[in-house]
């Protein structure tokens, strides 16, 4: 099973997201189930490497959010228009 490390986002908004992306990270969100939605940040290069694996979109993944493991599936992916970059991912809890 694929494991991805994540951190809880401290800042929200367009400016904070742009700073994340320029630092080699990007924003994401985890929602669903009985818990509240959680905004997270992911390392772009590590997620891009995991995305190339066969089971990234079809199977459950494990997100390690500040040490707490959550089982999720990819709900939606947003990409840059012409660069090979991820800009945002929505995860839904399994």
Swiss-Prot record:
Any Pfam family matching the protein: Ribosomal_L25p
Annotated keywords: Ribonucleoprotein, Ribosomal protein, RNA-binding, rRNA-binding
SUPFAM superfamilies: Ribosomal protein L25-like
GO biological process, alphabetically ordered: translation
Molecular function terms, GO-annotated: 5S rRNA binding; structural constituent of ribosome
Cellular component GO terms held in the UniProt record: cytosolic large ribosomal subunit
InterPro entries registered for this protein in UniProt: Rbsml_bL25/Gln-tRNA_synth_N, Ribosomal_bL25/Gln-tRNA_synth, Ribosomal_bL25_short, Ribosomal_L25_dom, Ribosomal_uL5_bac-type
Cross-referenced NCBIfam families: PRK05943.1
Function: This is one of the proteins that binds to the 5S RNA in the ribosome where it forms part of the central protuberance.
Quaternary structure note: Part of the 50S ribosomal subunit; part of the 5S rRNA/L5/L18/L25 subcomplex. Contacts the 5S rRNA. Binds to the 5S rRNA independently of L5 and L18.
Family: Belongs to the bacterial ribosomal protein bL25 family.
Full protein name: Large ribosomal subunit protein bL25
Organism: Pectobacterium carotovorum subsp. carotovorum (strain PC1)
Gene name per UniProt: rplY
């Amino acid at each position: 099973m694929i494991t991805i490390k994540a951190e809880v986002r401290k800042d929200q908004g367009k400016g904070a997201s742009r700073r994340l992306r320029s630092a080699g990270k990007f924003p994401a969100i985890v929602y669903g189930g009985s818990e509240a939605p959680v905004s997270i940040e992911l390392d772009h290069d590590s997620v891009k490497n995991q995305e190339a694996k066969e089971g990234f979109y079809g199977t459950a993944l494990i997100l390690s959010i500040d040490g707490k493991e959550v089982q999720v599936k990819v709900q939606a992916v947003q990409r840059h228009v012409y660069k090979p970059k991820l800009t945002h991912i929505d995860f839904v809890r399994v």
